[in-house]
Structure formats: structure tokens, C-alpha cells
A protein has these predicted regions:
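Single conserved hydrophobic/aromatic residue that forms the stacking wall/gate
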Residues: 1-7, 11
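Histidine-anchored, small-residue-rich loop motif
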Residues: 20, 25, 45, 168, ...
């Protein structure tokens, strides 16, 4: 295997312990199942699918943008697994046991775009709840620098639309069913209030 492929398509260590998010509402059981089973499956399947193809030595982002909306079934499989791998990398990095206070530069940008932090949170939760079936809810920065809340189905992500992901929440049922059962609104609200590391989110925004 090429070293580039090993770097791009391999499960990363979590940036915190299995029980680090429990106090914030994500149990150790959820993190173990989600990271070690669901996320790992995307990586394993993705590596099998890109073996021997033009994407074998490509960067993860190149694979995603190059296979998005591809006609071939094999290409669709590559996209789904590569995109979900990327999505989960963002998901883990945007959470943490610290960073609950939103830095002033981020809160100012959010307030300027959405009216207030509370209004942003309400809109984010509404978008996540409104995503029918599996998918993701995002806070993105668009090419013109403005912020927007988007939702994407299945494994589609902001890279497909030339947007920068600042914050992403997994709304596939496996991400919340152990801890919240079918209460997706409660899961999304808790994600924003008790799981997001806003300091990490602020580092992603471009001036």
C-alpha cells in the first residue's frame, strides 16, 4: 500500500478517551460502537473499493469530490465510504470534554449571520430534525465568507458544494439511539450545548 493511502484511509485515534464525553451526554457505549464499528467499517470498505483504481493513491478530499454524483455503481460505493470517513473525522474533532464557551469572534460571526447564538442553535436543530432519514447537519462557511446552516443526505458533505465545514452533526440513528432513543431533537440540542468544542470550531473559520 502507498503511504499516502495509509495516511488518508485509516481510522484515527480518538482525540479523547471513550468516556470523555459521557458527562456531556454521549455514553462510552455509543462512542465505542460509533467509532470502532461504524466509522471503522467505512474505512475498511473504502480501502477495499479503492484498491486497484485511479483513487488508490489520492487524497481523501480528492476521492470525495471526484466520485460525487458518479454514474458507476462502484464509484458511488467509493464516494459513500470515503465521504463518511471524512464526515466522521470532522465529527470527532468538533466535540470534546472542554471548549464549551464559544469564543467571542465566533459568537460575533454567528450573531451577525443568524441574529443571535440562540437563533442559530434553534435553526441548526430544526435543520437536523428536518433531515428525513439518515444524513448530517452542518454549519458551513461559503465561498463569499458568509455562514450557513445546511443538511445533507446520507454521506454527502460540504466538500461536494465547495463549502468549508465548521461544525457537523451526525443524524444517522446509530449516532444517538443508544443514549436518546428516537429523540433526535434532544440529541441535537445536547450536541450543541454539551458536546461541541467551540474553540475548535472557531479555529476553522476564515477571516
Amino acid at each position: 500500500e502507498s503511504t499516502r493511502r495509509q495516511r488518508q484511509m485509516c481510522i484515527r485515534d480518538r482525540p479523547y478517551a471513550y468516556d470523555a464525553l459521557a458527562a456531556g451526554g454521549m455514553s462510552q457505549e455509543t462512542l465505542e460502537f460509533h467509532h470502532d464499528l461504524h466509522h471503522k467499517a467505512y474505512v475498511d470498505n473504502g480501502n477495499k473499493l479503492i484498491a486497484g483504481t485511479q483513487w488508490e493513491n489520492s487524497a481523501l478530499e480528492e476521492i470525495i469530490t471526484g466520485t460525487y454524483q458518479a454514474d458507476a455503481v462502484a464509484q458511488n460505493g467509493i464516494f459513500n465510504n470515503a465521504s463518511q470517513h471524512w464526515n466522521h473525522i470532522q465529527f470527532w474533532e468538533m466535540m470534546g470534554p472542554s471548549g464549551r464557551e464559544m469564543p467571542s469572534e465566533l459568537s460575533s460571526a454567528i450573531t451577525a449571520q443568524f441574529g443571535s447564538v440562540d437563533a442559530f442553535k434553534e435553526a441548526f436543530v430544526a435543520a437536523g430534525v428536518g433531515q428525513f432519514g439518515s444524513g448530517w447537519c452542518w454549519l458551513v462557511q461559503q465561498a463569499d465568507g458568509s455562514l450557513a446552516i445546511t443538511k445533507t443526505e446520507n454521506g454527502v458533505n460540504p466538500l461536494c458544494f465547495g463549502q468549508k465545514a465548521l461544525l457537523g452533526c451526525d443524524v444517522w440513528e446509530h449516532s444517538y439511539y443508544i443514549d436518546f432513543r428516537n429523540k433526535r431533537p434532544a440529541y441535537l440540542t445536547n450536541f450543541l450545548d454539551n458536546l461541541v468544542n467551540w474553540e475548535n470550531v472557531a479555529l476553522r473559520i476564515s477571516g
